[in-house]
């Protein structure tokens, strides 16, 4: 649950969500991610550090640059946690829809 709290806290920040959403298009460098954002490259690096600590992002060296991408394991764990609520909501909806109207 600690990792889940960390992941939820990480994506609670609007700038981090923007960075994370940009990574959904594929791996990118800090410079690429910073383009068009209202924050500096060092700030983007700090946001990536938080996302990485939460298990949502991984990185690799490519020459002198670091390339960041969404970590499917961390994202899968977050999705599985969220899916439990979706499943409960669907079950409740199904039960309501199948009630006898009389």
Language-model features, listed with the residues they occupy:
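Amphipathic alpha-helical dimerization/coiled-coil segments
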Residues: 1-3, 21, 75-102
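N-terminal helix-turn-helix DNA-binding core of bacterial DNA-binding proteins
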Residues: 2-40, 65-76
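Short, structured secondary-structure boundary patches
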Residues: 7, 48, 64-66, 80-84
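Alpha-helical residues within the helix-turn-helix
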Residues: 21, 35, 46, 52-53
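Residues in the helix-turn-helix
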Residues: 43
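Beta-hairpin "wing" of winged helix-turn-helix
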Residues: 52-63, 69
């Amino acid at each position: 649950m600690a990792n889940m709290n960390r992941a939820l806290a990480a994506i609670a920040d609007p700038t981090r969500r923007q960075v994370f959403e940009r990574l959904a298009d594929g791996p990118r460098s800090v410079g690429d991610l910073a383009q068009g954002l209202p924050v500096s490259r060092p700030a983007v690096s700090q946001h990536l550090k938080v996302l990485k600590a939460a298990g949502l992002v991984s990185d690799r060296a490519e020459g002198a640059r670091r390339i960041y991408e969404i970590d499917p394991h961390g994202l899968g764990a977050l999705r599985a946690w969220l899916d439990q609520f979706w499943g409960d909501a669907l079950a409740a909806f199904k039960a309501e829809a199948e009630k006898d109207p009389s």
